[in-house]
Amino acid sequence: MGYALITGASGGIGRELAALFAADGHDLVITARSQERLDMVKTKLEQRFGVHVVTFAIDLSEANAPKKLHDFTTSQGIAVDQLVKNAGFADWTDFLDADWNRQNEMMQLNMHALAELTYRYGRDMRANGHGRILNISSVASMMAGPYMAMYFASKAFVRSLSEAVAHELRGTGVTVTCVCPGPTTTGFQKAANMSGRNFFTMTKPATARQLATYAYRRMMRGSTLAYHGPLTKAGALAERVLPRALTRRIAAFMDGGKPHTLKV
């Protein structure tokens, strides 16, 4: 059994997924920006499950970070046969009033890093004839999202890329699973600077553990695309039957509407 590599593993969904892999006896490579938080997760998992946990603190939004991570695992002789891309963030803002550095960081983390890690580790898995890849997308992948334009676009990228690569890897022993969750209690709302009435206050968010358990099961089944929660399933239906102009209005309302304070 090879290692499971999980990005964004210091908290939330990533930490819960790490625990699920460890419970099934998988050794782990866990990454996030904070070494201190990674060390805490490592200690708990090793003590509870008796697995080996390797930590690698890295900011995957930085240039060449995915290659650095792949070079590290390769140099350590770590064979990764389970890859989970969970790291990502959003920002509640008018697109033209956004901080461009933050928007660019979002593109790098949500799209570029995910794609490059899929490419590098996917090639290794294909050469070995087995492996699983899990990409966390969102209900946001199903429509355009005014006031969170870049985030919605990035999650549409994740879903499209995942489905296409899953098709290309048929018959190789490697599967790609894309899970689209709805609101989940992970600190997303605070990190995105959201306030007022929005999809977190208008719905009952899933817990990180609930979403992680669902995603883990779907990954192990080799599902290509999976929708978690009633809001996401409603979004999938809306994508098929409603006019795009209407879904944009719905998304803008659910995102909390126009931010009151412009960011420059």
Q: Which residues does each predicted region cover?
A:
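Conserved glycine-rich Rossmann-like NAD(P)H-binding loop of the short-chain dehydrogenase/reductase
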Residues: D24-M40
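Active-site helix of classical SDR
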Residues: T118, S154
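Residue(s) in the substrate-gating loop at a strand-loop-helix junction
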Residues: S138
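C-terminal helical subdomain
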Residues: C178, F199-G235
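Substrate-binding pocket helix/loop in short-chain dehydrogenase/reductase
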Residues: D94-M107
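Conserved glycine-rich cofactor-binding loop
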Residues: S10-G11
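Conserved NAD(P)H cofactor-binding loop of Rossmann-fold oxidoreductase domains
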Residues: N86-D91
